[in-house]
Amino acid sequence: MKTFSATPADIDKKWILIDAEGVVLGRLASIVATRLRGKHKPSFTPHMDCGDNVVIINADKVQLTGKKREESHYWHTGHPGGIKSRTKAQILEGKHPERIVTLAVKRMLPGNRLSRQIMTNLRVYAGSEHPHEAQSPEVLDVTSMNSKNTRSA
């Protein structure tokens, strides 16, 4: 029997909705990265974008364990003396709290051209509203998968 290698015609993408309220960030990002990549499917092909489209709501209510809220996120502007930093708490309370979730998922994917293509299948929203009702996404309950996935405030 030959090894199955998926072609674009073989791939069927589903829409998945995940509520991130009270979910631990790293565990959420790990589950989402697996779904985006398509590794949960028996027809997984490493060089193809065979994952699902994932919509995450309530990204501003994600939980961080330990002292990770006080850890800084650093970046460089490219100019001399352009090192910048913000704590994760500042980002979550700021204008774009969904960037914490997006960055966590991005860093759990391989750093190549395919992962940049895969990241276009991720949509993250800070509130509970999202414009993807027409796709009728299937709800994935991350909180019931494992008791360690949630943390109270």
Curated annotation (Swiss-Prot):
InterPro entries: Ribosomal_uL13, Ribosomal_uL13_bac-type, Ribosomal_uL13_CS, Ribosomal_uL13_sf. This is Large ribosomal subunit protein uL13. This protein is one of the early assembly proteins of the 50S ribosomal subunit, although it is not seen to bind rRNA by itself. It is important during the early stages of 50S assembly. Residues 143-153 have a biased composition (Polar residues). GO terms for molecular function: mRNA binding; structural constituent of ribosome. GO terms for cellular component: cytosolic large ribosomal subunit. Residues 128-153 are annotated as: Disordered. It holds the Pfam family Ribosomal_L13. Keywords: Ribonucleoprotein, Ribosomal protein. Gene3D superfamilies: Ribosomal protein L13. NCBIfam families: rplM_bact. The keyword Ribonucleoprotein applies. Belongs to the universal ribosomal protein uL13 family. Transmembrane segments: none annotated. Part of the 50S ribosomal subunit. GO terms for biological process: negative regulation of translation; translation.
